[in-house]
Amino acid sequence: MRSQVRWRLCWENELQLSDHIELAEFFRRTYGPTGAFNAKPFEGSRSWAGARPEFRAIAYDSSGIAAHMGLLRRFIKIDGADLLVAELGLYGIRRDLEGLGISSSLRVVRPVLQELGVPFGFGTVRPALHKHVARLGRGGLLVVKSGIRVRSTLRDALLDKPPTRIDDALVVVLPVGRPISDWPAGEMIDRNGAEL
């Protein structure tokens, strides 16, 4: 039987060092099984991998952190057209609670997105997660788009790598203040920053 989950909604500057330490450990345990490289950004007390979120939804239960979703408002470009979005990312859920699901996190974050006045929530997921996120699309919560390339800056400027990378990821769009029909058509999204 699962313990009761309670959500904490907080701005980034409300987190204490102890929160970052606990979150970093959560991400190392969550992302580590998918490869040591995926857990590496969370060494020490660093609780973000690429861009740092401005707002977090953190679920707790009797065992500690159960789930996390970060958001960051930013302007992206879709084939050159500017669009304000709230990027959703840095999603994680403890393995013993995987049935809690991303839909629960989105339901908690949606009122925050409405308060912030953004037209869309936006995120990317790797193609291997297509079946997982497609279920959410069937429920009308979001739309999954494929065939769109996404350009992002690297977190760090490195001497041996270009400053940007291009991914063929699945694009997840959550209509918030505008209908999905207002999402611009296009084949290239410029994130204009590091992935959340």
Curated annotation (Swiss-Prot):
Its main location: cytoplasm. Keywords: Acyltransferase, Cytoplasm, Nodulation, Transferase. It is found in: Cytoplasm. It comes from the Bacteria. Its EC number is 2.3.1.-. Changing residue 69 to I: In strain: ORS1096. GO terms for molecular function: acyltransferase activity. One of its GO terms (cellular component) is cytosol. Changing residue 102 to L: In strain: ORS1096. Changing residue 114 to R: In strain: ORS1096. HAMAP family: NodA. Belongs to the NodA family. N-acyltransferase required for nodulation. Acts in the production of a small, heat-stable compound (Nod) that stimulates mitosis in various plant protoplasts. This is Nodulation protein A. It comes from Mesorhizobium plurifarium.
